[in-house]
Design a protein with these regions (language model features):
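Hydrophobic/aromatic beta-strand elements that line small-molecule binding cavities or substrate pockets
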Residues: 160-165
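Bacterial N-terminal signal peptides that target proteins for export
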Residues: 1-7
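N-terminal beta-strand/beta-hairpin edge segment
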Residues: 41-118, 130, 138-151
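Extended amphipathic ligand-handling, pore-lining, and cofactor/metal-binding catalytic surfaces
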Residues: 171, 175-212
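Long hydrophobic alpha-helical segments typical of transmembrane helices together
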Residues: 202-232
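Boundary at the C-terminal end of the N-terminal hydrophobic targeting segment
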Residues: 18-20
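Bacterial N-terminal signal peptides
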Residues: 7-15
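N-terminal amphipathic/hydrophobic interface segments
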Residues: 23-52
Length: 232
């Protein structure tokens, strides 16, 4: 149903006669934005969209101001919440037919997102079937994970300490600084395989608006992230 809604709105926009400046109703643009957003978020997500100053100029859809609130927002099983503000957005109408919208221009983009240790803990269980009963503790700037890793019929109690790292400006990775694995004949790739399943924890490059991590804070209550369209 989401894809059907997307193509309906796309058809309405593409078939509209090109004019010097043609207004769009808030409802039309909201449907378009919601259809695009639902391609990137899991079904439990609750999204609210507010649009103002939308118009067609030639082959462009221009939105002066766009706010999106996701509470909760779920991405690949990781639950959190976010607030997105976009100003001065220009989108090519022809790009709607591809189903993957890339904005031609965004004057300003700001995203504030956060998640909790409980949500991360739940997501770890979903991401890896070999990770049994993971428990995560967050401290200022670091974390500790305790879990049992399963490989075939063997079980390996594990304690790992680490931090979060920004990679390439757009990804957030779990980086381990110290790992203790109990058991005999521990496979050399045991930890590496688990990290490969988890990382990247966040990947902003997958979204239609270019965003870069501006600030990443890890504290006792959870994780907070600030992203903008300005690359440092």
């Amino acid at each position: 149903m989401r894809q059907a809604g997307f193509w309906f709105v796309a058809a309405v926009l593409i078939c509209a006669p090109a004019a010097a400046q043609q207004p769009f109703t808030d409802d039309t643009v909201t449907q378009l934005v919601m259809a695009v957003l639902h391609q990137y978020f899991d079904s439990p997500s609750m999204l609210e969209v507010s649009v103002s100053g939308a118009a067609q100029v030639g082959d462009l859809l221009i939105v002066q101001d766009l706010l999106v609130l996701g509470k909760p927002a779920v991405v690949h099983g990781l639950r959190g919440e976010f607030l997105l503000h976009l100003a001065g957005v220009e989108v090519e109408l022809a790009a709607l037919t591809s189903g993957t919208i890339k904005a031609r221009r965004v004057q300003k983009a700001t995203v504030v997102a956060k998640s909790t240790s409980a949500a991360i803990q739940e997501a770890l269980s979903r991401w890896s079937g070999s990770l049994i009963n993971p428990r995560i503790q967050l401290q200022n700037g670091s974390f500790t994970v305790t879990a049992i890793l399963r490989r075939d019929d063997a079980l390996y109690p594990t304690v790992a300490h680490g931090a979060l790292a920004v990679v390439g400006g757009q990804q957030v990775h779990l980086v381990l600084t110290d790992v203790t694995v109990s058991g005999s004949n521990v496979p050399v790739d045991l930890i590496g395989n688990e990290l490969a399943r988890v990382n990247p924890l966040v990947d902003l490059s997958k979204y239609p608006i270019r965003l870069f991590v501006d600030r990443l804070v890890l504290h006792n209550d959870g994780i907070e992230l600030l992203a903008t369209n300005i690359k440092k």
